[in-house]
């Protein structure tokens, strides 16, 4: 009689024997082989550069199916979330797991408003920085400095201290971003106006002046709120994984978030929307037209890259991209702006979607393709695009840090390596 393999285990044959590993069932998506005992059973390690095939953790926060173009926050489809919620409501959902009651959301909003002010000494921190400093460098430095004002309230094992730190981050990080913008412009910092909503307050801090009242544009507020929602989480990306890895050392949440900001600063992660805008401007300035540019991309001409298409996870149309495109149309129509870059983007998207070269390679527009056009129309310079991404991603970083911090199974991150250096050798006695 032939033995039937246990369907809940995976069997590995290797020189010297076999080993079995349990298969963990996912609620949705791919099941996972648990290799926690791999080294003990086999004497080997695994190599997976870029963690393409490796689940580093269990998480209940966000689900992505890249083949089907699905993104869900705590089970809710992103299309429903973006059209029916607000940034702060989604932040609560991600951090605490369920939608807040009306009373919980009101209290959450109120606590954040009451913590928007920065210590006056921290405001002077900006005086030591050059006006040319990149806002992301300013942001990561300021978040690290922010923790020094709460030295007695950083215990990662004290739930009350953790919750207060979460509120402070949500309240103060957007203010720091706005002040980095004002620093670059050489304009005076405004104090937050806590009578305004989260998004309206942020827009006023960026574009208001001491000389006159700031006029709220509800279309811009709605569009920015949606963009922030769409960026709130994307499961185990590079910056989120960085936050979790740093947090695994029991570093406080300020230090962990600062590390995530630095990871986001990398051009392969947070700088894609700025690169898209530069590409569109390059097409415009060349005078050669979109089709000529597309042919250059297909011919792999030196220095020509198609930005804003394709994604490490999505092998179909990024579900966030459709929602961003809607917002782009609404913002430019509201402002009465005719931006040739948006026209170029639309033409480029249509050509690419109809071209087998791009379709066969699963190169579809991603969330970054239209965001830069919107931010530019709002008045943000391109160097502010990644800090805006950081504001959006902050609740996701917090949610993952908190999930890992509350999980008794969390271990300090310490990957193995495949050593490929010199073998043992003797130190020369005479040189």
Regions found by a protein language model. Name each.
Residues 2-431:
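Non-transmembrane, aqueous-exposed alpha-helical and coiled segments at domain scale
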């Amino acid at each position: 009689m032939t033995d039937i393999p246990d369907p809940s285990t995976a069997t590995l044959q290797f020189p010297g024997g076999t080993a079995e590993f349990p298969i963990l069932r996912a609620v949705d998506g791919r099941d996972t082989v648990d290799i926690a005992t791999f080294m003990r059973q086999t004497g080997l390690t695994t190599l997976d550069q870029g963690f393409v095939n490796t689940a580093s953790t269990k998480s209940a926060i966000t689900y992505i199916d890249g083949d089907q173009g699905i993104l869900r926050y705590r089970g809710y489809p992103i299309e429903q979330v973006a059209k029916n919620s607000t940034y702060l409501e989604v932040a609560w959902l991600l951090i605490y797991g369920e939608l807040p009651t009306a009373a919980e959301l009101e209290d959450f909003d109120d606590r954040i408003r009451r913590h928007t002010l920065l210590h006056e000494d921290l405001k002077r921190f900006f005086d030591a920085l050059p006006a040319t400093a990149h806002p992301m460098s300013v942001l990561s430095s300021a978040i690290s400095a922010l923790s020094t004002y709460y030295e007695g309230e950083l215990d990662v094992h004290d739930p009350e201290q953790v919750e207060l730190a979460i509120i402070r981050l949500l309240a103060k990080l957007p203010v720091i971003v706005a002040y980095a913008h004002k620093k670059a412009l050489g304009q005076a910092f405004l104090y937050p106006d806590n009578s305004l909503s989260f998004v309206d307050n942020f827009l006023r801090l960026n574009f208001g002046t001491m000389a006159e009242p700031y006029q709220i544009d509800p279309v811009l507020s709605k569009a920015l709120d949606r963009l922030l929602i769409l960026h709130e989480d994307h499961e185990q990306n590079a910056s989120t994984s960085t936050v979790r890895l740093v947090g695994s050392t029991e570093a406080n949440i300020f230090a962990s978030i600062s590390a995530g900001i630095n990871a986001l600063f990398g051009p392969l992660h947070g700088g894609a929307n700025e690169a898209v805008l530069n590409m569109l401007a390059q097409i415009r300035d060349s005078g050669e037209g979109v089709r000529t540019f597309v042919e250059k991309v297909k011919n792999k001409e030196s220095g020509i890259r198609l930005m804003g298409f394709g994604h490490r996870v999505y092998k179909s149309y990024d579900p966030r991209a459709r929602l961003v495109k809607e917002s782009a149309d609404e913002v430019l129509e509201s402002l009465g702006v005719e931006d040739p870059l948006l026209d170029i983007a639309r033409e480029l998207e249509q050509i690419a979607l109809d071209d087998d070269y791009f379709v066969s390679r699963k190169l579809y527009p991603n969330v970054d393709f239209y965001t830069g056009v919107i931010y530019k129309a709002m008045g943000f310079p391109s160097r502010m695009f990644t800090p805006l991404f950081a504001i959006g991603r902050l609740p996701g970083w917090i949610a993952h840090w908190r999930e890992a911090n509350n999980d008794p199974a969390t271990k300090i991150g310490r990957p193995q390596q495949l050593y490929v250096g010199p073998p043992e050798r003797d130190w020369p006695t005479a040189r």
